């Protein structure tokens, strides 16, 4: 696992924050949040999960959220981290949930930014897509398609030039040397996301938990192949955020109105201020 371990700038407050990136993201996409948390006195650990970015992309691997959580736990043990705050975005929100369920004594607080998995897609009627079908889809990834998807879903139809670097990051991985391994691991990870819901276990989270939700997000795995009547019910974050916040015993919700899937990238100053204020409560 590749990772960043960023010490607190100035006066350390003694707390650690582990960042869990999303499916189309890397640890590097947390850059403004890492800086804000470090300046606020936190030690920040931001790994690339196995299968992503700077980490190994094995030819044969049984992907599960439990396995990725175990990998992350082993990394934290190696770094001497006993207690931590966990912050996950998108697919990283599903992983953060699983991590908090597996290691509740270690997790002081849990925060999730537009986590996917606020609904169980297969239970709602989204058709199954095989790993080979995902693989074929991933091999076709190009900048134009990624840019259009991110503009619509991540930024609610808006675009700024600074978003382009994250398009090129993703496309570079999928078009560069080793792109077949990247696509294969991506396919295995999509299968994990679809088949391993965490939705039914939110009620078991016992630590203070914050949902940070851009309410114009429409992300839903498999919505592109779902029947119209199913697709119409998926990915409504304006409804999913409040619903799931009520399922979590110590759940809180902060809504970023009018924003999409990545408020930490779209409005980093506001997002980071909101996060640091909640952590300081």
Q: Which stretches of residues belong to each language-model region?
A:
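Conserved HGGG/HGGXW glycine-rich cap/lid loop of the alpha/beta-hydrolase fold
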Residues: 2-54, 274
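Active-site loop/oxyanion-hole signature of alpha/beta-hydrolase fold enzymes
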Residues: 6, 39, 49-87, 91, ...
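Conserved catalytic-core motifs of eukaryotic protein kinase domains, centered on the activation segment
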Residues: 29-31, 55-61, 121-124, 222-223
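Flexible "cap/lid" loop of the alpha/beta hydrolase fold
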Residues: 97-101, 108-141
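Helix-loop "lid/cap" segments that line or gate small-molecule binding pockets
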Residues: 146-160, 171-174, 186-191
